Every structure is written in structure tokens, then in C-alpha cells.
């Protein structure tokens, strides 16, 4: 019996993540923080898009990964519920929903990485585009060609929510729909005018926006769901290792929007390795000893 308990206790904690820049960054931070606690860790970073990583967590193939509060709307099929557009409301809702599935949400980062739309700097300056109201006018004038993920185009909470809130419709012929959810691809397409694109789906904490001379359109009507990143862990794993909760709370408390943009930029723009960026950040904050 003692050997069984010991083997279970020392089984490596499997840390997963999505394949986007911020996912691999925050996944690396989780792994490093757990290793600093003296826990054995197996990394499965960059597993794939949301549904693949989520399924791995539910099946027990991984123990924890960084997820966004707003994705609870999609997990529960309640994208139109206005509660998801409030930071605290979204956190409480997803925590309650996932508790029934044997999952625990830990403390979230103070940064909203919601979906936004950014426009080429030259076009934005020439046409005076700064807000989604301005963007809607440009769409009506036939000026906009958008690069976005299939999920962004099709999800009721993404592009359709913008269209409803700002009274515009972007025809499919003026949308380049790309598989996956990597905004590094859509932002670069917009910046470089690939396939005639001059606007792209981005996230609020993307690190490449300034470097690519993209102007983010302000969502003044709060059309979008709040997406704050937090570790999600299997409840049985947390019961075995309760020290995970305070350790990761200290890590995620350091990740405000400006910090995430800077760290994401080091990876997406400067080409640094996510683990290196994560390790340096945690060391600078005194979280690795």
C-alpha cells in the first residue's frame, strides 16, 4: 500500500498547452513553477487547439493547462449570455461549470486576451480608423479584407457578435479564413497585405501589434467575451498536490496585459524560445528561488 501511494504521489504532473504563443508561454511558466516546488513534470506543450487540449484534460491524459475564462461560454453553449462579458462573472461561471466535471480553476491573470480586430497602420491613419464604429464604416465602403481563423468567423461570439453590435456585414468574399487560432499568422497577413488582406483577427495581449504597425480597433460596446487566462487542473491532481494553488497564484498575478504583450513579443517578434522567456520572467519576479 505504501509503495502504491508513493508511486501515485511521484507520478509526473503532465502540463499541456495550446499551440499558440501565449499558450506555450504560460504552459512553460506552469511547468517551471511546479518543478520549483520539487514536483516531477512532463511537458506536453503545443498539443493543439482548444478542443484537443480540453479533451486531454478531461480524459486524464494531462493534469493541467492554461485556459481562458471566456471559453467556458463555448464549453457550455451559452455564448450569448451577457455574464461572459464581465470578468468576475465569467470566472465564477466557468469555475462552477467545470467543478461538476472534476476540474478546478485556479487564480486568473489580470489581463483580458479577448478577440479584437486590427487594421494596417497606413490604412487606419489614412481613413481615420480607431474604433469598431470606424471599422464598420470602412466595411460598408468596401475597404476591408480580413484574415481570421475559421472559429472567429463562425462562432456567434466572435465576428458575428461584432457585426451585430456595430451593424455591419463582412461578405465571405472579403474574408480569408485560416485553420487554427494563431493570431501571429493573421496579424502578419494583415500587416504584409498577403492575398489582399488589410485587417486581421488579433488578441488583446498579442506581442507583435506595435512591431507590425497594426492599429487595434477599440471595442467600445463590449461586444466580446472576457478572456482571462488561468490554470485549469484536474480536481484529483489538486487534491494530491494542494501546494499547486498558491504557487501558480503567485505566477499568474504577475501577468497583466502589458507584461503579456511584452513577453509574447519576445517570442513572436524577437524569436526567443518560450521556455527561456518564461524562465527569465519568473526569475526576475523572484519566483524561482
Task: Enumerate the predicted regions with their spans.
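Short, well-ordered beta-strand elements
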Residues: 10-22, 39-44, 142-147
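Short, polar/charged alpha-helical segment
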Residues: 21-40, 160, 164
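Beta->alpha turn/N-cap motifs
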Residues: 46-50, 60-73, 89-90, 149, ...
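Ligand-binding "clamshell"
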Residues: 76-106, 169, 194-197, 207-221
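A conserved helix-loop-strand patch within extracytoplasmic ligand-binding domains
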Residues: 88-146, 253-257
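A bilobed periplasmic-binding-protein/Venus flytrap-type ligand-binding module shared by bacterial periplasmic
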Residues: 115-125, 227-241
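Ligand-binding pocket segment of bilobal, Venus flytrap-like solute-binding proteins
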Residues: 141-219
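An extracytoplasmic/periplasmic, membrane-proximal ligand-sensing/linker region
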Residues: 153-168, 242-289
Amino acid at each position: 500500500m505504501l509503495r502504491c501511494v508513493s508511486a501515485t504521489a511521484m507520478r509526473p504532473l503532465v502540463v499541456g498547452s495550446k499551440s499558440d504563443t501565449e499558450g506555450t508561454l504560460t504552459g512553460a511558466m506552469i511547468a517551471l513553477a511546479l518543478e520549483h516546488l520539487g514536483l516531477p513534470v512532463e511537458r506536453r506543450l503545443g498539443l493543439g487547439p482548444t478542443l484537443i487540449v480540453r479533451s486531454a484534460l478531461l480524459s486524464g491524459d494531462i493534469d493541467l493547462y492554461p485556459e481562458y475564462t471566456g471559453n467556458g461560454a463555448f464549453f457550455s453553449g451559452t455564448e450569448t449570455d451577457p455574464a461572459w462579458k464581465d470578468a468576475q462573472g465569467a470566472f465564477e461561471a466557468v469555475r462552477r461549470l467545470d467543478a461538476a466535471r472534476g476540474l478546478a480553476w485556479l487564480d486568473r491573470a489580470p489581463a483580458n486576451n479577448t478577440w479584437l480586430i486590427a487594421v494596417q497602420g497606413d490604412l487606419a491613419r489614412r481613413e481615420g480608423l480607431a474604433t469598431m464604429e470606424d471599422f464598420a464604416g470602412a466595411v460598408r465602403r468596401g475597404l476591408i479584407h480580413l484574415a481570421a481563423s475559421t472559429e472567429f468567423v463562425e462562432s456567434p461570439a466572435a465576428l458575428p457578435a461584432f457585426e451585430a453590435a456595430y451593424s455591419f456585414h463582412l461578405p465571405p468574399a472579403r474574408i480569408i479564413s485560416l485553420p487554427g487560432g494563431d493570431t501571429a499568422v493573421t496579424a502578419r497577413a494583415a500587416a504584409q497585405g498577403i492575398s489582399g488582406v488589410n485587417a486581421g483577427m488579433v488578441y488583446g495581449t498579442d506581442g507583435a501589434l506595435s512591431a507590425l504597425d497594426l492599429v487595434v480597433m477599440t471595442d467600445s460596446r463590449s461586444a466580446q467575451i472576457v478572456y482571462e487566462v488561468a490554470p485549469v487542473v484536474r480536481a484529483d491532481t489538486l487534491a494530491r498536490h494542494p501546494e499547486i494553488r498558491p504557487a501558480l497564484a503567485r505566477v499568474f498575478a504577475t501577468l497583466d496585459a502589458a507584461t503579456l504583450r511584452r513577453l509574447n513579443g519576445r517570442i513572436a517578434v524577437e524569436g526567443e524560445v518560450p521556455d527561456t522567456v518564461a524562465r527569465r520572467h519568473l526569475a526576475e519576479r523572484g519566483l524561482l528561488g
